Regions:
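Domain-scale recognition of functional cores that engage charged ligands
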Residues: 1-225
Length: 226
């Protein structure tokens, strides 16, 4: 309630970092909202569903089979890169040793990812190896190893803090989805558009708010048309 008015919708602009829950009041505030009838974007369950660990689990065929129609699975799996758990998993025995071996042999081919969003939290190359070799068991549980994506480069103008720069770039395309659920029943599940983030080719990290990339849009070109 705000005054005598019930809050219908809460949008979380923050709440994705441990730094957002430094004190008891912040944690109690989140608990209060979770137990209310307010629509949350996202609620705790949806936020957890977007974590890197869930992405890694969905790359396993036996897990993906539980959530997607079988005719779709080959096409979906063809878009995945390899992701590995850093701890022993009953679904994938020997996975952690395999992940460590892959990272140490070819660090330039992998990225270490925590359960975080917003950019600026990943580890690459030598820093990744240093991090892996000094992580506690609980820290290993909170990270996954992902094969690095090597997108095709293109030239673009980037505008950052009022300064423009024409440089070689790479872009990431993501889909916007809307999911509205109530007490376990899905009321709405729809694709509703896309997001393009473009950054300099020599930048490892992503994230618009973190200052690593810029918003962009797609431009459709017909082959053979001048």
């Amino acid at each position: 309630m705000i005054g005598n008015n019930p809050v219908a919708l809460v949008y979380y602009r923050a709440g994705y970092s441990p730094a957002d829950f430094k004190n008891t009041e912040a944690k109690k505030g989140r608990e209060l909202i979770e137990h209310s009838s307010t629509i949350q974007t996202p609620d705790l369950w949806m936020q957890l569903a977007g974590m890197k660990k869930i992405q890694q689990a969905l790359t396993l065929p036996e897990i993906l089979n539980q959530f997607a129609p079988k005719p779709w699975i080959p096409q979906m799996a063809s878009t995945f890169v390899k992701m590995h758990s850093l701890v022993e998993d009953t679904q994938a025995p020997g996975e952690s040793l395999k992940a460590m071996d892959l990272a140490n042999k070819n660090p330039e081919s992998w990225v270490l990812k925590p359960q975080r969003e917003g950019g600026g939290n990943n580890y690459f190359d030598k820093k990744m190896i240093q991090k892996l070799n000094n992580m506690t068991p609980s820290e290993l549980k909170a990270h996954v190893l992902m094969e690095r994506i090597r997108p095709r480069s293109h030239s673009a103008w980037l505008m950052v803090q009022g300064q423009s720069d024409y440089t070689s770039c790479v872009s990431e395309i993501g889909r916007y989805g809307v999911l509205l659920a109530n007490r376990g029943t899905i009321e709405l599940n729809s694709d509703c558009g896309y997001l393009v983030r473009t950054k300099s080719e020599d930048v490892n990290e992503g994230g618009v708010c973190a200052g690593y990339s810029c918003l962009n849009t797609l431009c459709l070109e017909e082959k053979g048309v001048p």
